[in-house]
């Protein structure tokens, strides 16, 4: 039989402050509302090549050095490809990052139980499938939602809450449809936009249950990854002085 939870008066409920993981990547933390909420699920979308995987590898690296375990599950790149990028953009790689080259969400769940991470990164959601889902190819709205619901259960587990960040590729029409459905499910939606300036990236929060929407953080894509532009005014002023005007900076 179903167990009904007690009905409470709103005035009797004790409000709780969100428990967050601070990454130390200033613009990322600011756009997120002060860091990653521990029982949250976030989707980050962009066109291919915008820097999603690079930024999240930096996020994983940063919090791993603060003692948090991270599972980075990739259905797009091999573990050696991920290691090559890490060697290029990171220093002193932490032992707290586990890389899983996988397209089975069921196997990700098993790995999560074994490793017990604080953060799970899925790159990208369109490459994963669930065995018990209706027959459909990876990237279809059906598979995308089944995988996302499984990740939601992991994130919102009362006994062991975890943060989950999902990468979503903006490519085919049906994959975009799956992402739009995901926006209603997740807590936070982040979009990376590449400007006319080849180096400049904007990280925008179009939805955030734990912070302000419409926040924009600025990054510069360099050989060492996505560098947080902690003083955008100074950055844009320098660009103007150099005669290299940036669209959207006026």
Model-found features: residue ranges?
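P-loop NTPase motor core
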Residues: 39-43, 48, 54-55, 92, ...
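Residues at the starts of beta-strands that form the adenosine-phosphate
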Residues: 69-70, 96, 163
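Conserved P-loop NTPase
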Residues: 1-10, 113-119, 126-128, 185, ...
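Short beta-alpha junctions and helix-cap segments that line functional grooves
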Residues: 59, 85, 176-179, 202-205, ...
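The Walker A/P-loop phosphate-binding site
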Residues: 2-92, 109, 113, 244-250
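Glycine- and other small-residue-rich loops at beta-strand/loop junctions that grip anionic moieties
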Residues: 75, 97-101
